Structures are given as C-alpha cells and as structure tokens.
C-alpha cells in the first residue's frame, strides 16, 4: 500500500472510529438515564453498547496497525 493510500485509510478509519465513539456515548447516556429511572438497562441499549464497544475496539486496533505500517515505511 502506498503512503498516500495508507494515510487515507488511516484517516477514514479514524473518522469511523470517531463517529462510532459518538454513537456509543449517546447510548451510554441513554443507559445512564434508564439506570437512574428504573435501576436497570434495557436489552436494546445493552446490545447496542456491546456492539459499538466491539466496533470501537476493532477500529482502534486497525488505526494502530495502520500507524505501525506507516512508521515502518
């Protein structure tokens, strides 16, 4: 992969990570409201948070991998 393609891929991955993190934050705020109101978290909220947490971890790993590739070049 060329340097420009790697930089573009990293930027795209970082953008996706940022939007995923924002969406996760929104679901976490919803969960906090549910906990405050009922002392439980709805299944939909819990499922969304788990899915987004996994996606964020995968995107973070991809960013690190791309950064390693770029530093090795």
Regions found by a protein language model. Give the residues of each.
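Intrinsically disordered, low-complexity terminal tails
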Residues: 1-73
